[in-house]
Amino acid sequence: MKIIGISVRTTNQNGQAMQDIENLWERFFSEQLLAKIPNKASDAIYSIYTDYQKDYTEPYTCIIGVEVTTFSTIPDGLEGREFPEQTFQKFVAKGAMPQAVGAMWQHIWDSDATLNRTYIYDYECYTEKSQQGDASEVDIFIGVKE
């Protein structure tokens, strides 16, 4: 999967990720990056969590962007990253956003000991389904070992 977008290095400690990722989303929309990224595979927006120092309790990188078919043109100020195929366990956050996503992540963290996560990368996929008010849905994919 090839992604072009913007990123931030953050941590879940002391609520830092909530602020950093919220600021990243604000930047993504205020700079109208969806419209500026060429060669889009779709209009789905991905929030990818990668470069884990160890696990969800340690620093990691969040990238917000879109899947592209090629890296032939990467706009200034954006970055391109390619992610390998891996096995995922899918979770679906349902309800008002972003609260539903936050609640699902809490469930994932609470289940960490049994998920057998890879910590290579995980991602959320935002589509038209994620903009339906209290009936919104966001798919969350957690990388797991086979």
How would you describe each model-predicted region?
Residues 1-146:
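A solvent-exposed interaction/effector surface
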